[in-house]
């Protein structure tokens, strides 16, 4: 679309696999030659290609956590690398987002960045109507239709009868995110990782999303030997089954990493949905990323609570971002759309602020807490992670390292503490967090470490 609208010369689109595995060397030679591509559309690794006359760097959806590469090394933030590339090249830099990261928003408010705010939606279309639905009441009254509250069910029925389309968002893959014994309550976990295994009904297996191990579903509970495992917390596969059960005439497709194994499948699904060959699209966060379908008049968030509760100071920011982004898929053209958000914690401040659709107020409230506890954007964080197959050895080493760090860095050191998933691929993990306030020399700190 970009090439058709504004370009008269060649451009190249780079995915991670295309750039790195297949054509990396060829692209490098092309960009270093006398006739480089004038426009490169790429993932985060594209910032490391050579550019001779770079004039503009655009980072779309700059708030996205996927710009960070955590594993394997080198670990970097693609957005920050793009900003540095632009500065080194003397190019203009444009960061775009409806829900900017706190770091970028702080830079804009302080005058470090220029700030352009769009106060109306493209085409002057009204923002969708948000409906927050308390699942607790409907579950208590046994009024749920599978994964759907009566409110979402009726809205889906109305939209589908009018020949329009629906997007359902559930940020969990598989049929069930974990299996639990109906007698003793134990949860079936991976043998190599400290995490529950996801159940896939279509192949009747359990899969660990951390190490990739597979196992069959045991006939009886592995702990008490008497109970049976039951499904808990539905994933996209279960949502797809529910849609087919309650809306048998609807044409349904699923968009997640389990079915979108390559670019061709992704493109084919998008084309089918855009052309009206599908009625309901179910997906994980993939459905929230910049998709533009004019016939989508309803977005359903199946379980908003699953976006919260993570031991991460950015958890509320990411939940807000995700809800606002996925809500933006509804009613992008023509009549106003609707968004039905199913949840149980109706008092959460994140949901109250999403209802107001006021990012400035959201930022103000959370940034006050971050400043109080010295978190970004008011500090820089260094995460030190230690791993070992022996948990006792690891704990002793982590305690000693933390003691040595505190001798120099004092209260800047937090931990050691176990992360949410404390064991991956048979390796135990412990983390130490260092908070470096504004003005502290990071080069000296890194040299000390």
Regions found by a protein language model. Name each.
Residues 422-435:
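Short, low-order "capping/linker" segments at domain edges
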Residues 1-38, 42-395, 403, 431-432, ...:
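Inter-lobe coupling/hinge segments of SF2-like helicase ATPases
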Residues 409-419:
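Short beta-strand elements
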Residues 371-376, 419-425:
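Short, flexible, solvent-exposed loop/turn segments with mixed acidic/basic and small polar residues
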Residues 397-403, 442-449:
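Short amphipathic alpha-helices in soluble, non-transmembrane regions
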Residues 413, 437-438, 446-449:
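Structured alpha/beta or helical-core interaction and ligand-binding surfaces enriched in interleaved
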